[in-house]
């Protein structure tokens, strides 16, 4: 058996976080007829904020589209883009979380946390499936929630 390093978390945060003094959360939920995307956007932002605040060394606020706080040089904004579709009696919420900072073009994140999905009821009310999906995405986005990854053993092809 050969042991190679797996996808490992960086030992230090990416340059995007250098000098950051606050975190903004900006959500946008799209949906078809009968989907209250405004209410779902607000609920999703509240859940992301609740999870992001765990062990956070920085203040975290939710903001709305058009808020000039996105342009703050000392802020990292988490862009949470989601889409909702009916899935039987439930709804399927697919989302992506990406950090954005205006002052860090050289340190921008090209490929961050992969898109995830979870079923939800009419409202995002602390759904265990959504909590797990959001926590996984945030652990790949926020340095203080990063989960250490150990080297993974791989079987050699002999």
Walk through the language-model features, giving the residues of each:
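C-terminal/domain-edge helix-coil "capping" segments
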Residues: 4-6, 11-15, 106-158
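N-terminal segment of the mature soluble domain
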Residues: 25-75
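A structural "domain/chain start" motif
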Residues: 2-46, 147-158
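A generic structural micro-environment signature
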Residues: 21-23, 46, 50, 86, ...
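Surface-exposed short loop/turn segments
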Residues: 66-120, 124, 128
């Amino acid at each position: 058996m050969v042991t190679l390093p797996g996808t490992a978390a960086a030992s230090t945060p990416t340059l995007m976080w250098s000098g950051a003094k606050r975190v903004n959360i900006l959500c946008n939920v799209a949906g078809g007829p009968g989907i209250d995307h405004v209410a779902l956007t607000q609920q999703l932002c509240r859940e992301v904020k609740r999870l992001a605040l765990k062990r956070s060394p920085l203040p975290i606020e939710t903001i709305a589209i058009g808020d000039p706080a996105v342009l703050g040089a000392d802020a990292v904004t988490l862009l949470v883009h989601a889409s909702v579709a009916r899935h039987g009696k439930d709804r399927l919420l697919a989302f992506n979380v990406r950090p954005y900072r205006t002052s860090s073009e050289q340190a921008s994140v090209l490929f961050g946390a992969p898109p995830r999905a979870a079923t939800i009821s009419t409202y995002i009310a602390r759904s265990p499936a959504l909590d797990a999906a959001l926590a996984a995405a945030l652990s790949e986005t926020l340095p203080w929630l990063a989960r250490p990854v150990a080297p993974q053993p791989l079987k050699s092809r002999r």
